[in-house]
Amino acid sequence: MEPETAVRTLTVNGEARTVAFPVHHTLLEVLREELGLTGTKHGCELGECGTCTVLMDGRAVLSCLVLAAEVEGREIRTVEGLQRGNELHPLQRSFADLGAAQCGYCTPGILMAASALLAANPSPTRAEVRAALAGNLCRCTGYQKILEAVEGGAALARGEDWQPAPESLHGSPLPVPEER
Amino acid sequence: MLRLPAFRLRQPTSLAEACRILSGEGPAARVVAGGTDLWPNLKRRNQKASTVISLARVPELAGVRAGGEVRLGAMETLADLERAPALVTRYPALARAIGSISSPVLRNLGTLGGNVCLDTRCTYYDQNEEWRRSIHYCMKAEGRICWVAPSSPRCWAVQSADSAPMLVALDARVRLASSAGEREIPVAALYRDDGIDYLAKRPDEIVAEVALPAESDAAHLRTAFFKLRRRGSIDFGVLSVAVALRTEGGRVTDARVVLGSIASFPSPAGEVARALIGAPLTTESIRAAAQRSRAAATPMDNTDFDPRWRGQVTPVYVERTLRAAAGLDAADGA
């Protein structure tokens, strides 16, 4: 079948962009291929891994399961639109300061899902953070630092002074051997 | 990369227009609500669509109307429904069942109508094109044989919609719209015991609304829902249990126990319900009734976990769900 072409004006990171694309392409494909916004990652493409998470009208959604032709009039935000001017988003600061990424492939999706959580709930409990990130898979970190970084980002966003705990950065001190 | 196949997209702005397009296009057209089931199925080429009709701009399918009964628009997202005050206060087990579907980022897209129509699932079907081609496909899509039961004339794919067993237990009804008119049927009558032809609705009908009767709310029924799965964060169930009990003077006067993710349709465990009726809700009566669920559950080797184990643990989880409904234990799991 000859692909139908859609022409739509999409609002991405506050900018209105008129783009033409095949009507069966997902938001993920149009963000990466037509708009050059490759911060949003391609993962399972079936809604199972969460690495393509973006915000649509402030809600975290899977861009691999949204048709780009359907998002006209919706406010799309990707990881490229998370910082304000030259200021990193508090979550970007806490993730960088703590080193809450290893390969980094899941990080954009996790930042977006976590930013939607903090916008709705500035002081989430550990359980609430875990629940909000239930659809975001990370195969490297074991999640510990990600959870700490979301809590750190929440603290920074509340204007609190937050530093990564030394044991989170360097591990716990070795036990001192007993004297013989 | 898994791209969608090319299709024509139609974006009607009223239910009548959507119905008219669907009846004009015929069965080669597919209707999409949230897309969380249809898009993966199209990407893996499990399903085909020459035309896709999006319901996103159909205003009649949105909204929750709470009066005596509660009516839920088919396009309401799962995320909105799991938090909707009318569900949380009056149908808490349904809110819980909906909240157990997949992950939060998916529930922000997925809809109630889409969940009710969820395609049946199977180890030999929910795979990509290359994988399925290597086994010459299966009878649910393009092949001739059921790999789960090779001598079987039918498909045994599993109905895993988490809302379905709870809606059946609550005696909910579903409103179907088509260009020929509308009809309302019990949710229980929407499902067929067949992995391929799993919905009793006609191809030209659109699920428009789900109605929850006033007599099924928390003031009238004790309810609970449980879902067994490998990862609590995201997975499809391998068993779900929906329970709704009516009691009078400490004795059960009516009971519905419906098992999900274990057969091609939400299966009522009638033996369990019959054993409960007339009995008090005690540890002993619940255990005795739950034992009878073993016969209602004959899991096949078509999803996660060993099928024998899934059968063995069915009475255990039926018992736990009944205890939660009876208030003997706090509800947990899901």
Region locations from a protein language model:
Chain A
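Signature of N-terminal electron-transfer/Fe-S-associated modules in redox systems
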Residues: 1-180
